[in-house]
Amino acid sequence: MTLNFSKPIFALAPLAGFTDLPFRSVVKKFGADLTVSEMISSNALAFQNRRTIKMLEKSPLETPYSVQIAGSDQDVIKKAVEFINSKDGIDIIDLNCGCPAPKVVNNLQGSSLLTDLPTMAKTIKSIKKYSNKEFTSVKMRLGFNSKNHIEIAKICEDSGADFIAVHGRTKAGKYKAEVDYEAIGEIKRAISIPVIANGDITTPQKAKWVLEYTKADGIMVGRGAIGKPWIFQLMTNYINGNRETEPTKELIAKVVLEHFDQMIAHFGDYGAIIFRKHLHTYSKGYSGSSKFRDLVNRIDNVKEMRDITKEFFLI
């Protein structure tokens, strides 16, 4: 299945440490149209770091599938893209122009590319030139310290991006400033390629409002999907006028355990430790959740953690 913008797209945003293969495979079962890898260093790809190569893997459900890379060194970008070209099942290469983390920004990657638009343009063009994948995309913010979102979006379009995802804050706004949906709408009106809206879209009602207000071609959900991977199904049902039905306790338990099992299959026993943060979010709102979180923080045995998790969610 290719990417079809004839109706709104519902995409999972890349989130470091969360949107790995097991989690992406769970959200696909709830109707996410597009999944994106965690942000991957182009340098690590160029030098074929073993751990990084594993981050490229996808589940059979992930079609279309996007790999997001970070970088600005043109030789390194070329090598990274050529390595991605050798992997089947990847439909999109996405350039990260939004990450505000200091370790990324300090190396002219992520949102710092918004301070050097000629280099950003050159990097998009390099990806487009060397990629054998169907799409090239960009995930951007509204600017670095101040907003110059239309200029950035037009450069993305002119440099060959097939679509963009826009986080409605500047880099300075990080994840706390109010999201400027008006600016996303301005971008949509200013360019001809599809625009996906991103930022604080955590409910079906908010998703519908953002689509109507911005006229965007899709919604990208990040933190709103953590602990609630079924949010994509709720959103599509609500927007299509179908009855919005929250998942049953039994379904949630099934999802949590399936996610846990996939973590172990993908990461080995260490997957149980990684899964603790997911259990923290899955258990929010449950009676006894504080005690449960404290307990799982002290468990690293796979069987013991699974048994305790099953017991907690099926009470």
PLM region spans:
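N-terminal small/glycine-rich loop or linker at the start of catalytic domains
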Residues: 1-10, 43-64, 99, 104-109, ...
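Structural preference for beta-strand elements that scaffold enzyme active sites
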Residues: 9-11, 34-36, 64-68, 91-94, ...
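Conserved, mostly hydrophobic/aromatic
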Residues: 12, 27, 38, 67, ...
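Active-site beta-loop-alpha junctions enriched in small/polar residues
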Residues: 15-17, 40-42, 70-72, 98-100, ...
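Short, charged, surface-exposed secondary-structure boundary motifs
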Residues: 45-48, 174, 228-234
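Alpha/beta enzyme core
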Residues: 78-109, 118-193, 209, 213
